[in-house]
Amino acid sequence: MVITHNMKNKKLLLGIAWAWLTCMSANAEVKLPAFFSDGMVMQQQTRVNLWGTATPDAPVKITTSWDKQTYKTTADAKGAWKLALSTPSAGGPYTITFDDGKLTEIRDILMGELWLCSGQSNMEMPMKGFKNQPVENSNTDVMNSRNPQLRLFTVKRTSSFTPKTDVVGTWQEAVPATVREFSATAYYFGRMIQQQLNIPVGLIVASWGGSACEAWMHPDWLKAFPEAKIPQSEADIKSKNRTPTVLYNGMLHPLIGLAMRGVIWYQGEDNYNRASTYADMFSALIRGWREEWQQGEFPFYYCQIAPYDYGIITEPGKNVINSAYLREQQAMVEHRVGNSGMAVLLDAGMKTGIHPGKKKVAGERLARLALVKTYGMKGVTAESPYYTGMEVKNDTVIVSFDRAPMWINCKDRFESYNFQVAGKDRVFYPAKAWIQRSKMLVKSERVPHPVAVRYGFENYVEGDLFGEDLPVSSFRSDDW
């Protein structure tokens, strides 16, 4: 009887121990943010951060297939862990295995170039377009989009009062079904980068239509802008995509620290009615993102908003605000902020639509900036000429430009129809404008003594002044 009793106790103890071990094993599993997952692209030839959660205080072993090395770290009391390791040159596929008592594996990892793509609706606009707002030639481009070397990740729209630690999204290979739903601007950017470099490219899109610049910023960066009302509680969030800080918290914060090459940005339409602070605010956003990432002065390329008749969305009885002031503010930023560049879209707007269909133009101009300024491509022009000054000789204004080594051109003619001049009365009149190498000569019979000149400084304009094939931004010499 005693022997039987002891055997029963031993069996009971063994059963309890097995159940405990099984329970611990079930809980002992590394959890990773959504962007650390199968099919991801990791930035090549750099130090990358990996992070996640595991069993509190447990050791975590990370094994990488490209160097067959095992790295060790330890989760803290809350289960959080972080580790930095080196990545090889472009290639793959590779795997990473995580072990804290239970194995977790990321498969089909490619090493290549990783870019973050952010902004509002013109960045968000998918290849399939919006209702009654198609993307030009998208059907053919979608049909031909299959490319296992191009990987896509879209962050789900998330607005939050407090900073989040993860996003919702999955990595997808570029095939017609996935490309159709993906950002058109980002796709055309990534496609050109991948084709020209012939290495894997990953694109992470974090965008929300109608979002304000302030929504993508940390509250500390907005202290210089008292008009930006930072929410003090959930009740203060009156708009999920415009309230300051809410998209930084919900969509950007979880990505901070992810090793990448740089950022492309297409935003500004929501800020057109408060343009006077945009250059300062956008510059603060770029500096803030760079400081948060702690990856140096990474490239930041952005689109200037395209021309559109904002009178269409102006309430009856209210003055129509000229969005050229916002374009002017955007143009200031590339001269203030290092390692940045602006894709001018003055020839790619749509009078009756705020979402122009020329997304290939936008994406590929951003890609040219990256190819030349980041990847060192020679023989290609990536930056538009820009206005540097004017002088008056008799009744003619002589306008000068920089970044115009091949002179200014108007494509199929030698004159521009978008210039105006004004005298001391500050009244602008249409002017005749013709090319003289890298300068423009401008005059109007109605202004015998000009003191100011403007080009394309209207809500909607069809840009007709170029340096090679890149349009000159709208500009003005005055500050009236």
Where are these regions (language model features)?
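Cell-envelope and extracellular/periplasmic
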Residues: 29-480
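Bacterial Sec-dependent N-terminal signal peptides
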Residues: 1-29
